[in-house]
Amino acid sequence: MGIKFLEVIKPFCVILPEIQKPERKIQFKEKVLWTAITLFIFLVCCQIPLFGIMSSDSADPFYWMRVILASNRGTLMELGISPIVTSGLIMQLLAGAKIIEVGDTPKDRALFNGAQKLFGMTITIGQSIVYVMTGMYGDPSEMGAGVCLLITIQLFVAGLIVLLLDELLQKGYGLGSGISLFIATNICETIVWKAFSPTTVNTGRGMEFEGAIIALFHLLATRTDKVRALREAFYRQNLPNLMNLIATIFVFAVVIYFQGFRVDLPIKSARYRGQYNTYPIKLFYTSNIPIILQSALVSNLYVISQMLSARFSGNLLVSLLGTWSDTSSGGPARAYPVGGLCYYLSPPESFGSVLEDPVHAVVYIVFMLGSCAFFSKTWIEVSGSSAKDVAKQLKEQQMVMRGHRETSMVHELNRYIPTAAAFGGLCIGALSVLADFLGAIGSGTGILLAVTIIYQYFEIFVKEQSEVGSMGALLF
């Protein structure tokens, strides 16, 4: 059934635009250039407003997810990476459940990637239509069919651009992946803005600066009671404060510390006697994949819930899924869940909120830990990083584990890899919950993604530089 499905979608994959693999080795400086160009295009798209929208001043229903999904309201990057991640989530789960069987051959892998891309474009069209028809940019009946179609086309083309930019980096022209690059950029931009924003906000206490650090100096300069000003800078409500900033730095440090946790399995060459090495199995074996997939799941649940709430607000089943309220305190107007399943799957706003509603906190913790562990365990089976796949890679490199025969390598790797995947996913979820409870800027999920992605890029740079260095040693 699985192979038949991949064969059925094969003709459709041919019509999709594709980035060809490089025919030569791309040099490090060239990779940096292509990565910078990709990031520049993404940032430009984040600033270009959608043509034809009547208004985007209403409460933002996806405010909480925008940082993680690298989206920017009212611009070409309205959808961000949501369609790509959602298609990846669904296709990987289908493959993991063996509903779609993907073989080890390059042909099957290519067909699977093509199916994922096709599904991603289908989701882009679907989300574009939902955004327009639910009135995010104004009443569709007032805008007219032509304008609605124009906005949908703009969102579709922007989605295609994101997909191709990601593929450009994935094919080896740049460093890392487009998805990771866009997420990290968006989160870091948010953290810097919340710390140094010069924007003023009219609160009940008077005009205040949004940026936590700028607010500190402003409060100390304008208030006569310096102790009270200092306390306000650290603990003010509805705007970024210094405790949020300290929590963010603390979580950054903790995640970087855990990145170093790993088990080194001793391996040796089957061909050359005396050639020894180690195969590292990290605590975060699947890196940030669990948190990305979990974010995609929650964001799509939010989309469905708010779409149904807008149409059938009094329905009991719709209310059980989620009820929503609008707020504009301390920033732009945004919608947030106040009841139903969506409320319990959303993070508490602060540690005080945890004490006010402990049931909400417990459900959220269980959901985060369980979903991250599940996605991490599932991911290794469909991404070519399971014990069986690793044993196959070592065999192809003519490496064996010391003290074990080739036939027993899979059994030995199975002792470590599934455990590292599940426990690593659990730790990722726990750190995300901790960051949320401490009130870290950019949400716990966002901080986790930013740190793991930046660390990945650090490792890529070190690897690329070592290769350049070894080549230089050979040449000179």
From Swiss-Prot:
Q: Which PROSITE patterns match?
A: SECY_1, SECY_2
Name the source's superkingdom: Eukaryota
Q: Which residues form a coiled coil?
A: none
Write down what this protein is called: Protein transport protein Sec61 subunit alpha isoform 1
Which residue ranges run through the membrane? 34-53, 77-96, 118-138, 145-165, 173-193, 241-261, 289-309, 355-375, 421-441, 446-462
Organism expressing this protein natively? Bos taurus (Bovine)
Indicate where this protein resides in the cell.
Endoplasmic reticulum membrane
Lumenal topological intervals: 54-76, 139-144, 194-240, 310-354, 442-445
What gene is behind this protein?
Answer: SEC61A1
What's an example GO cellular component term for this entry? Sec61 translocon complex
What topology in the membrane does the UniProt record assign? Multi-pass membrane protein
Q: What does the UniProt record say this protein does?
A: Component of SEC61 channel-forming translocon complex that mediates transport of signal peptide-containing precursor polypeptides across the endoplasmic reticulum (ER). Forms a ribosome receptor and a gated pore in the ER membrane, both functions required for cotranslational translocation of nascent polypeptides. May cooperate with auxiliary protein SEC62, SEC63 and HSPA5/BiP to enable post-translational transport of small presecretory proteins.
